[in-house]
Design a protein with these regions (language model features):
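C-terminal membrane-cytosol helix-exit motif in multi-pass small-molecule transporters
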Residues: 164-183, 370-378
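Cytoplasmic helix-loop-helix junction between adjacent transmembrane helices
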Residues: 98-136, 315
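Interfacial helix-cap and linker-helix signal at transmembrane-aqueous boundaries
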Residues: 30-31, 61-62, 146-154, 229-230, ...
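Conserved MFS/SLC helix-loop-helix module at the cytosolic interface between two early adjacent transmembrane helices
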Residues: 53-90
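Helix-to-loop junctions at the C-terminal end of transmembrane segments
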Residues: 54-66, 253-266, 351
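Helix-loop boundary and gating motifs at the non-cytosolic
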Residues: 2-48, 204-205, 215-232
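Juxtamembrane intracellular "pre-TM" segments in multi-pass secondary transporters
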Residues: 1-2, 178-209, 393-397
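Structural signature of the two symmetry-related core transmembrane helices
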Residues: 70-84, 164, 269-283
């Protein structure tokens, strides 16, 4: 069984590593091909819209068929085909198609997260999800770290050659994944149950905040940050420093939030602070002309955004009944993909109309909107908590 776990972990890594290997250089690459910011934003947003359209149907269909492996193989094939298209053409239309395929590939992640826990006993499921989540972060970090250096050595196509090679290996290895007959079974998703979960007010609030958070990160670090960095004197090989400056604090923040910030401030206050600082440091980016100061801003931006995502993930299912949490998580993941689509799409339009700085102002304001919503909702949550406390004390008396 250990061999099966290790193989699955490797395949999971090979799904994400190729997709993030070219992310820091992707927008500048399209710019060199003559892509306007509006088009670049649309290409970046296609990754999110395909996840929005495909993630829930893939989850539901795999539940109905009670198999995951075919969907995993399909995801690896889509990833490989995406990389091959990037390699074979400089056509902006085909680049859009290739990035959309990458989005379909990412949507199959739902099948990965259902199959992997079946290698574990019931009480080890959280450990399983922790392991596979770490692999995603590791793949993202390693992929993004090397892209700038690869471009300097082998040109703009270099990352796609390496990504294509790794994705071919991923397809081959995915054929040997073991899908156990026994393990944790999930009931097929019922439409009525999905509708009930989606109407849950707490989930909708958190999902809206997550849309705003994903709009910020996919318009900045996973979007136009590299373009702006190149305009203030960074070279392609130095994009690696920006990735390190952002991603290391981003990862550290995920550990910091649960152990320090939430016990100290509470969930809603911690979230308010994180969104506010993420907004401030995003709004600062267009004012920075010094490379050293730019890296400093990325450090604080990465840390602030790193606080937000685990907080939202916990809040998404906190008030959902345990038997509906899998459904809630599927719905939550599908809904926040709206942010992966809308953020880069509108940032690209603003950049085209008013220059590269405009997109940062746009998503920075989104962060302030999120902060305002949290202040309003946080007061309501505090009021409800006081009312519950009063009722309990009266009942006790």
């Amino acid at each position: 069984m250990n061999r099966n776990k290790y193989l699955f972990i490797v395949v999971s890594f090979l799904l994400w590593f190729p997709q993030f290997l070219y992310v820091p250089i992707f927008s500048p690459y399209m710019e060199t091909l003559g892509g306007k910011y509006t088009f670049i934003g649309f290409v970046l947003s296609s990754y999110g819209i395909m996840q929005l359209l495909c993630r829930l149907p893939i989850g539901i269909f795999s539940d109905v068929k009670k198999v995951r492996k075919p969907f995993i193989i399909f995801g690896m094939l889509a990833s490989m085909l995406s990389c091959v298209i990037f390699l074979l053409t400089d056509s902006l239309g085909w680049i859009l198609a290739a990035r959309a395929l990458a989005g379909i590939s990412a949507a199959t992640w739902v099948a990965f997260t259902v199959l992997y826990p079946r290698y574990f006993a019931d009480h080890e499921v959280h450990r399983a999800m922790g392991s596979i989540s770490f692999i995603v972060v590791l793949a993202q970090f390693l992929g993004m770290s090397f892209s700038g250096s690869i471009v300097s050595e082998w040109g703009w196509k270099g990352p796609f050659w390496i990504a294509g090679s790794f994705s071919i290996l991923g397809v081959i290895l995915s054929l040997f994944i073991y899908e156990p007959k026994e393990g944790i079974e999930r009931e097929p998703l019922k439409v009525k149950e999905l509708a009930t979960v989606i109407k849950e007010p707490s989930l909708m609030k958190v999902a809206l905040l997550s849309i705003l958070a994903h709009s910020i990160i996919f318009s900045t670090m996973f979007g136009f940050t590299s373009n702006y960095a190149l305009t203030i004197g960074f070279h392609a090989s130095e994009l690696t420093f920006i990735v390190f400056a952002f991603m290391i604090p981003h990862a550290i923040a995920t550990l910091f939030i649960g152990r320090v910030l939430v016990p100290l401030l509470g969930e809603w206050n911690a979230l308010k602070m994180a969104f506010f600082f993420a907004s401030v440091f995003t709004l600062l980016i267009p004012f920075v002309q010094s490379r050293e100061l730019f890296l400093a801003v990325q450090i604080f931006s990465g840390f602030s955004l790193g606080l937000i995502f685990p907080l939202l993930l916990g809040l998404a299912i906190e008030k959902i009944a345990s038997e509906k949490r899998a459904t809630a998580m599927g719905a939550y993941q599908a809904i926040y993909a709206i942010g992966i689509f809308t953020g880069p799409f509108f940032a690209g339009i603003f950049n085209s109309l008013m220059g590269i700085k405009a997109g940062f102002y746009f998503v920075g304001v989104l962060g302030l909107v999120a902060t305002l919503l949290i202040i309003i909702w946080g007061k309501n949550h505090a009021k409800l908590a006081v009312e519950k406390s009063v009722k309990k004390s009266k009942a006790g008396a």
